Amino acid sequence: LFKLINMKIIYGSSKKKGVSAFIKMIKAIENGESIAITPDGPKGPKEIVKDGIIKLAQTTGAPIVPLFWKVKNHKLLNSWDNFIIPFPFSKGVYIFGEPIHVKRKVTAKKLFQIKNSIQNEFDKLTKEVENYNFNKKVK
């Protein structure tokens, strides 16, 4: 799906090619590209923010911009993260959060606080997108 809309894919996880993927993401950001990652990691647990997204923002200075989406018609996979495959031409909605900046030099305590604030923002936006009503008329 991403290749159809001309988006590059960087493969990697905390178990496989993690360092290589991290370096490729840094280079992409340095080249002015935007990247999207799933912050709960490849192993879960579902919807729990991992350190990778914070380390990437800290290393590059790029902000974390929360993005959540929902489609009306989809197939729900029986996977640990309940992965969704949208049906073609289904209605959808995207909800963006405010950019979150992470300074390059911060204490471990501050990083913990940042991670908690990111998790809280993600939880809030997850509920917002899950409660979106496709039948409600938009003015």
Each language-model region and where it sits:
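Catalytic-site beta-strand/loop segments enriched in glycine and acidic/polar residues
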Residues: 26-56, 60
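Positions that flank functional sites
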Residues: 17, 44, 71-72
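Membrane-interfacial terminal anchoring regions of lipid-handling membrane enzymes
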Residues: 30, 113-139
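Generic beta-sheet signal
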Residues: 12, 38, 66-69
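Short acidic active-site motifs
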Residues: 20-25, 52, 110
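A cross-family acyltransferase "interaction/gating" segment
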Residues: 48-108
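Catalytic core of membrane glycerolipid acyltransferases/transacylases, capturing the structured
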Residues: 1-24, 60, 76
